Structure formats: C-alpha cells, structure tokens
Amino acid sequence: MLKIASAGDLEEIKNFCRNNPFGAYISCRAVAYGFETGFSKLWCGRSKNDELVSVVSSLGGNAVILAKDGCDNEELSFMISAFSMNSVLTDYDTGTKCFSKRFQKKEIFRFDGCDFKLNEIESEPEMKDVYSLFLSCFPESYQADKDSYLSWLSDFVFRKNRKLARIKAVVLDGKVLSAALTSAESEDCAVISSVACNEKCRNNGYGKAVLLSLANELKAEGKNVFVISENRSVSEFYKKSGFKNCGFAAYTERHNNV
C-alpha cells in the first residue's frame, strides 16, 4: 500500500534507490527538498511483509517512479490518474503496466568511459547565457519569460549548493558555446541532461567535450552516470561518447491521459 513518506524513511529510500537513474532523481529530491514541502511529495509502497517495493516522488507535479517486484501496479496507476501528475517518468516495464494510454519510450545509457579534453571547459559559467542556450536548443522544455528563468536558476543553485547538481560549459570569448548539467545526483548515481551546443558551433566537438568532462568527473567520484535519450540521433551521439544501452524508460504527460 502506498503511504506518504516521512523523514524517518530517508535512509531506506536511499538504499532502495541505489544504482538506478530513477532512484537518483528520487534520492536527490528527497535530500534536497525533504518531505514536508508543498511542492515536493514522496510516497512509499510496501508489500504485505512491510518490504519497500515502490517509491513515488512528485516535484511540482512531475513524478518519478521506481518500482520493483511485488509492487501494486494497479495502485500506482490509480495514483497517477487521481493526482493528475503533469508528467511521469519510470522504467519501461512499469510504464507498460501503469500507463493506460500512449507514452514515449526512451533509451537509457550508462557511461563506460571515454577520454576527451578541452581547455575551455568551465564549471561556473554565466547562468543566464546557459539558459539562453538551452532555450534555443530545447524550446519545448524551457520558457523565455523571466519568471521561468528565475525558477530554473533557483532550483539549480539550490541543488548545486548541496552538491546535488553541477554544470560544465565551453566558453570562448565570453560566449557559452555548449553546456551540460546533471538533473539529478545521489550518493552513487547521476543523470546528465540538457546537453546543448550553439547551432553555429556544432560538429566541432563542443557538445561532446562538456558531456565527457561532466561524465568523467562523476565517474572519478565513483558514481554511475546515466543519460536518458530523447531520440535515435541523440542515442548515436551518446554511443559515440562512451555510453552503452542499459534499458528503457517510459515517459508520459498529462495530455496523454495517463
């Protein structure tokens, strides 16, 4: 049965979420935002033997689910619908059992290792310029208004100050040419997202440079590094950058009628 989690569940949740990209999101949110905030919620699902079998994390209505054998898929499906989640991300097997309508199938990659060096890599770029780059590359995910930028910035800085997020960028002559950041970090895992490169500078290795700078730094810290690929062309980019397929994710948004 799914029940609202409390701070006393944190260590059990972190252990349950180890070595898993969805678990990285859940652990990162739990550590960063806790259990008592209005926009961040966590639920734990337990078996009849009181064993933890599923965790649901919702941040601003965007949910991530990690479920294992013995979870109640019908209860998860009902919860997704009842709480009108804006979006839901989970593993492919759970998605096929819990999403009643269509969803996107995404490829998951894990970093095996690949060397690539570029001197112009920075860890403290001008964030407004980074946001502008992300906006130009991912207009469906980023908004041009000031409030959206400030909300994104405050969330990233909040997590970065707690060592739950980081960024790498190529900056030449004061201009951000490419950037990549982690959307989630836990004690043993990290998920890299938003690898962006200025359209005029593509095919020069700048996107690969920030991706590998970030991935190698995380790997050196003993973390498993994951990316979740949006499409086939991006998947090829990851394959050429030292990442190997390790599974599939399922993603849906509210308009798909979960």
Mark where each language-model region is.
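Short amphipathic alpha-helix that is part of the acyltransferase structural core
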Residues: M1-Y25, I108, D112-S151
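Acyl-donor-binding surface of acyltransferase catalytic domains
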Residues: V56-E120, Y251-R254
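Cytosolic beta-strand hydrophobic patch enriched in CBS
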Residues: L42-S47, I167-V171, F226
